[in-house]
């Protein structure tokens, strides 16, 4: 059987109004992913106003309006296919959403398309988004220098902006091999989106669509320690206890000895895997990305709850006593100060957490500490902080197990901040092997 094409999640990033949604919309349009009936309606509308050449702009506006009214023609979640890849465009345009979804999005992005307007060049959010992409471990970047029509498709201006962007990407730690392509284009007119533009004969690199085809699928983190955040614990007649969850890292086989932490048992729930199923079919080995149910001997349904994490007994998950984290503040009605106690969301867990120390404000564009021990943190600021979970929770250092090192902080029904765990002080747990 031919192997299915790899799935790659791509996030579109860049400064507000540099054309992220137009670029995604144009990609859909040129690939025939926008229903003809939708186009027809808009053509009629455009004719009425004598602006037939603006059909595409109308299309985008129409979708924006429909989004505002809550209709589901959402550019945000686009699926498309290239000769080698299935691409899911994970993210909606919009700064706040982007920042939030980098962390809480159902799927972590594997690659990013950085959209930069040729007339404006690198702006504040260009920089901030690029830093966030780097922080969250995105290591493939396509740069699309948009609005070349605004600078008369001038090669000199393209080279200037290209150099600005490359300088920024190198400064924050990207290397040449992380940068797939730097493409001049004008997504409004479809230049170098899917079709090669005839307005820039001086450019002979890939189009955006071709660059998406060049992306490599992420390596499955099979060599990392086993971690399965638990979604549910069931008791099934004739089988016994069944745990369900998505394998984030490592691999699981029948016969493996596992421990589930923090669990209702003070020293963790220990058991042996009897069998594994995915989509009602038995599995000999579960790998990262697999959503599985596995039956265990020695663990009762009541020992385990959603938010606990299963690992191998000889390499147990880390239950955190304290966490030193790098956070980006997204929203707060006033400011975050020491003593603030919102809710930490990580993998399938959410627990109350307290801000113990604000160690230093960080420049979100460079990662440099700009103020030691600040009094308060406001939206738009980044900082290194010390957090204390007020209930037991598993979280891992981002540089060791990134899948369990990203988190969001929520309060009042909103995402207050997102972050990564830099250091985790483990709770002392006596594990009886």
Swiss-Prot record:
Keyword Cytoplasm: yes
Region listing for G2, in residue ranges: 70-74
Region (G1), start-end ranges: 14-21
One GO cellular component, as annotated: cytoplasm
Positions of the UniProt region annotated as G5: 186-188
UniProt cross-references to InterPro entries, sorted A to Z: EFTu-like_2 (IPR004161), G_TR_CS (IPR031157), GTP-eEF1A_C (IPR054696), P-loop_NTPase (IPR027417), Small_GTP-bd (IPR005225), T_Tr_GTP-bd_dom (IPR000795), TRAFAC_GTPase_members (IPR050100), Transl_B-barrel_sf (IPR009000)
One family name in Pfam for this protein: GTP-eEF1A_C
Keywords: Cytoplasm, Elongation factor, GTP-binding, Hydrolase, Magnesium, Metal-binding, Nucleotide-binding, Protein biosynthesis
Region feature G3, mapped onto this chain: 91-94
E.C. numbers: 3.6.5.3
Function comment: GTP hydrolase that promotes the GTP-dependent binding of aminoacyl-tRNA to the A-site of ribosomes during protein biosynthesis.
Protein name: Elongation factor 1-alpha
Organism of derivation: Nanoarchaeum equitans (strain Kin4-M)
């Amino acid at each position: 059987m031919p192997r299915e094409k790899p799935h790659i999640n791509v996030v579109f990033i860049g400064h507000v109004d540099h054309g992220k949604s137009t670029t995604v919309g144009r990609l859909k349009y040129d690939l025939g992913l926008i229903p003809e009936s939708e186009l027809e309606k808009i053509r009629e509308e455009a004719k009425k106003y004598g602006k037939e050449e603006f059909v595409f702009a109308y299309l985008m506006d129409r979708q924006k309006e429909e989004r505002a009214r809550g209709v589901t023609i959402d550019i945000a979640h686009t699926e498309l296919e290239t000769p080698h890849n299935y691409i899911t465009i994970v993210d909606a345009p919009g700064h706040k959403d982007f920042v939030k979804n980098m962390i809480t999005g159902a799927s972590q992005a594997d690659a990013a398309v950085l959209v930069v307007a040729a007339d404006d060049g690198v702006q504040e959010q260009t920089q901030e988004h690029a830093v966030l992409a780097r922080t969250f471990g995105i290591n493939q970047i396509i740069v699309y220098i948009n609005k070349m029509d605004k600078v008369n498709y001038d090669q000199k201006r393209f080279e200037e902006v290209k150099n600005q962007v490359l300088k920024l990407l190198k400064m924050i730690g990207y290397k040449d091999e992380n940068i797939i392509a730097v493409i001049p284009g004008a997504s409004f007119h479809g230049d170098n989106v899917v079709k090669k533009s005839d307005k820039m004969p001086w450019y002979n690199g890939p189009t955006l669509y071709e660059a998406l085809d060049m992306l490599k699928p992420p390596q499955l983190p099979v060599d990392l320690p086993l971690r399965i955040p638990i979604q549910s614990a069931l008791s099934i007649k004739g089988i016994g206890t069944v745990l369900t969850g998505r394998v984030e890292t490592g691999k699981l086989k029948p016969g493996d000895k596992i421990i589930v932490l923090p669990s209702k048992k003070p020293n963790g729930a220990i058991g042996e895997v009897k069998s594994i199923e995915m989509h009602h079919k038995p599995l000999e080995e579960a790998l990262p990305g697999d959503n599985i149910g596995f039956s265990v001997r020695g663990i009762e349904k009541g020992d385990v709850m959603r938010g606990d994490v299963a690992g191998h007994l000889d390499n147990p998950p880390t239950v955190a006593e304290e966490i030193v984290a790098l956070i980006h503040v997204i929203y707060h009605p006033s400011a975050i100060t020491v003593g603030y106690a919102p809710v930490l969301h990580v993998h399938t867990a959410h627990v109350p957490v307290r801000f113990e120390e604000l160690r230093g404000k960080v420049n979100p564009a460079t990662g440099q500490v700009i103020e030691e021990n600040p009094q308060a943190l406001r939206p738009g600021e980044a900082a290194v902080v010390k957090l204390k979970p007020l209930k037991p929770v598993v979280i891992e250092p981002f540089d060791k197990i990134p899948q369990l090192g990203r988190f969001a902080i929520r309060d009042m029904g909103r995402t207050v901040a997102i972050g990564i765990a830099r250091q985790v002080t483990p709770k002392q747990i006596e594990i009886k092997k």
